[in-house]
Amino acid sequence: MKPGSKNSFKSLRQISINGKNYKYFSLKEAEKNGLDGISKLPKSIKVLLENLLRYEDDLTVSKKQIEAIKDWLKTKKSETEIAYRPARVLLQDYTGIPAVADLAAMREAVKEKNKDPNPINPLSSVDLVI
């Protein structure tokens, strides 16, 4: 199952701009389809909610995590750990170079076992600034 393939709250929408189609997750639609009251969430929490909707797959992001955001409105606290998956990661050289070295070492170890090293990649796009 690929990320975002669940769409439990039927929030996936499409918009056409200059003849090109773009998909997005509508918080208004999610609110209509079970996430009551989310329009009252602070903007920072809405960003987290949109990210959860985008990556819901029942493996890394579950419906329970999404509902925990809605439930936060009642109690202003939650014991549920939620996933956050940024679209892009920016690394400076102090953190980026060791990460690249780790990836290279993992690829080399996999290659030595006669396996395909190509799947060993970051889940998110990464920019390394040196």
Regions found by a protein language model. Give the residues of each.
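Fe-S-dependent hydro-lyases/dehydratases of central metabolism
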Residues: 1-130
